[in-house]
Amino acid sequence: MSTSAVITGTGLYTPPEAISNEELVASFNAWVDLHNEAHADEIANGSIEAKTHSSAEFIEKASGIKSRYVINKAGILDPHRMVPDIPERPNTDSSVMCEIACLAANQAI
């Protein structure tokens, strides 16, 4: 008779940081302002349309989402970046997804 390990529970990784719709909209609207300022001439001559501001109410109505958990909140909310700042890792290091999977598996055990 052989013995094998079985994970009988479930684990769910939840990132430690969260972004509210209000925070996301403030960042997005700052990006809109930067974009419109940088492209003022093209907007004025009609070659491109100006971007418009969003609102927390619009996001909630369109998606039903009030807040989201994220990795690297600062990078996402930076209007010059608007994406997580996750440094590239060498192939000898575990990936971010691997770390998340291990954290979830440890919760399940």
Residue ranges with predicted function:
Residues M1-I109:
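Conserved "HGTGT" condensation-loop signature of ketosynthase/thiolase-family condensing enzymes
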